[in-house]
Design a protein with these regions (language model features):
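Oxyanion-binding and handling regions
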Residues: 1-22, 29-36, 40, 51, ...
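Phosphate/pyrophosphate-binding loops at sites that engage ATP/ADP/AMP, CoA/4′-phosphopantetheine
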Residues: 42-58
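A short glycine/serine-rich beta->alpha loop
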Residues: 25-30, 63-67
Length: 179
């Protein structure tokens, strides 16, 4: 059984297929063309790992924050695949998925930022303790003068493998984070 990971909250399309230690993920900057690129890329990934859509048993979807339309694309596509395959759906915060690969155990906190409108940023602050993510500042809209002085990651793409690695901490179901 494969797990499909998908995030379209940012200008990037993050898509992956994972099973245990094996799997592949791709991050492609598509700006506002997520819907055009998503299913052809999924077909490519399925071919690369030698799997069929029927073998997808779980989906981990990025819940945002981010582009309203982008969030809806991942949710609609992901829920459609889940319904067709009878797969379970889980949600993970997109900011956490973007910084997870850079968080070191008991290391300094990181604040991933996605550029929002009106000179604002979507941001949150995280650290890793005991192998688990720890949220120090909940997701919200921030002005430049509100940003912490260190540990900033500006517009990192959500990571497909991080979405998979965060599955043990994910909540079943998905709830978009519109800020």
């Amino acid at each position: 059984v494969w797990t499909l990971t998908l995030d379209t909250a940012t200008p990037y399309l993050a898509l992956g297929l994972f099973r245990g230690e094996e799997g592949v993920g791709r991050v492609v900057r598509v700006e506002r063309r997520h819907e055009e690129a998503l299913f052809p890329l999924l077909d490519d990934l399925l071919a690369e790992v030698g799997a069929r859509k029927e073998e997808i048993g779980a989906l981990v979807l990025g819940e945002g924050p981010g582009s309203y339309t982008g969030l809806r694309i991942a949710l609609a596509a992901g829920l459609g695949v889940a319904l067709a395959q009878g797969a379970r759906v889980y949600g993970v915060n997109s900011l956490l998925a973007a910084c997870w690969p850079y968080l070191e155990e008991s290391g300094p906190p990181l604040t991933p930022l996605f550029t929002a409108r009106n000179r604002l940023y979507y941001g949150a602050t995280y650290t890793r303790q005991g192998g688990r993510p720890l949220e120090l500042l909940p997701p919200g809209k921030l002005r430049a003068e509100e940003l912490p002085p260190t540990g900033l990651l500006l517009d990192p793409p959500p990571d497909p493998r991080a979405l998979y690695e965060l599955l043990p901490f994910a909540r079943e179901g998905v709830e978009p984070l519109y800020l």
